[in-house]
Amino acid sequence: MADEAIKNGVLDILADLTGSDDVKTNLDLNLFETGLLDSMGTVQLLLELQSQFGVEAPVSEFDRSQWDTPNKIIAKVEQAQ
């Protein structure tokens, strides 16, 4: 999958989960500090990433600091491809 498709797919998932388009315009926005993503949203995010991109990220191994901005999430998905 092309990087642009991954980026747009991840941003669409984040916008749907957070209810905010800010995630599409500020890719360094801290999703947890701003309250846009919580633990339940994190589980939903991981399920969506697995479903759409085949990314395996067990909740038990989830390190919030590695997944706290749209840019970091996009990079994780790209690495998994």
Swiss-Prot record:
Where does it live in the cell?
Cytoplasm
Alphabetical UniProt keywords:
Cell wall biogenesis/degradation, Cytoplasm, Phosphopantetheine, Phosphoprotein
Sites where O-(pantetheine 4'-phosphoryl)serine occurs are at S39
* Modification note: 4'-phosphopantetheine is transferred from CoA to a specific serine of apo-DCP.
Provide a GO CC annotation, any one: cytoplasm
Q: What is its main location?
A: cytoplasm
> Which Pfam families does the UniProt record give?
PP-binding (PF00550)
Q: Which family does it belong to?
A: Belongs to the DltC family.
Under which name does UniProt file this protein?
D-alanyl carrier protein
